[in-house]
Amino acid sequence: MEHFDVAIIGLGPAGSALARKLAGKMQVIALDKKHQHGTEGFSKPCGGLLAPDAQRSFIRDGLTLPVDVIANPQIFSVKTVDVAASLTRNYQRSYININRHAFDLWMKSLIPASVEVYHDSLCRKIWREDDKWHVIFRADGWEQHITARYLVGADGANSMVRRHLYPDHQIRKYVAIQQWFAEKHPVPFYSCIFDNAITDCYSWSISKDGYFIFGGAYPMKDGQTRFTTLKEKMSAFQFQFGKAVKSEKCTVLFPSRWQDFVCGKDNAFLIGEAAGFISASSLEGISYALDSAEILRSVLLKLPEKLNTAYWRATRKLRLKLFGKIVKSRCLTAPALRKWIMRSGVAHIPQLKDYPTRFTSPTSRM
């Protein structure tokens, strides 16, 4: 039975970043259910927008995005729609439009060979015994059993590690549903849609590489029905759909209180969405995945006497920031307050009636 310093479960942005940063400094094994290459197998349903905080993480690490990860087009504003109030506003945002699956595979490709990575693998069982973490997983057609001094759960919303550490912990969850359509809009756009009759979270749309992606986060019980109802409503706002090319869904966490952030115990640690580190106001998680991976790297390499306590303290600033997102979310999903903010016109950038489209040139009006 092989023994490692660190076993990482999940290689999304958080797990991949941590594995890369610990390579050569600790003996690391990492398990991931995605394939190493291609589009077969699991892929994360996600709008695929890289927020400024995530961009800062790459600047800090000296990384640049390869062209095959970047999607087309790059858009500089978000069309915000309040369905009940029939209001639409445009707000400037500096997101990078990416192909999420290609991004995840690229992040994995950066992990040095010194890390033992198992792609297309399934973690079956974890337990703690004799001051070691035991992990049984299936990869390459057979089951393997390893031990590790430290266990890291980077396994997302349905984290097996979080459920093992905190079996009674309850956090609000939604089903995220999105569909892909052939792009029909003359001008591509991003949008953020609020309709409290449909969900107390929000919905979105993104133009990406010739497709129009429409999705949202809905109550688990009847999410599909609510999604369909919202699509029908959006025709009043000139949204064009047609026949769906692809449909996706997954569970997404929605932290709503301070206790929803859990960092681990007994030499087991949680990073990224597994720890509840996801914005309640935007459901953006990549930046917090990268930040929590960096914080845990620093703690593990310093080896303080009480690692879990040190990690909890080190994430305090991050948790406070995310708690601020909970407060912001409550403001955005309060119909009267949202309507007042949007009607005020604060930060709204009006679009010219005759702005150029892909079918007209900027000089056609001269």
Swiss-Prot record:
SUPFAM superfamilies: FAD/NAD(P)-binding domain. Signal peptide: none annotated. Belongs to the CbrA family. It comes from the Bacteria. GO terms for molecular function: FAD binding. This is Protein CbrA. The gene is cbrA. PANTHER family: CONDITIONED MEDIUM FACTOR RECEPTOR 1, GERANYLGERANYL DIPHOSPHATE REDUCTASE. InterPro entries: FAD-bd (IPR002938), FAD/NAD-bd_sf (IPR036188), Geranylgeranyl_reductase (IPR050407). Pfam families: FAD_binding_3.
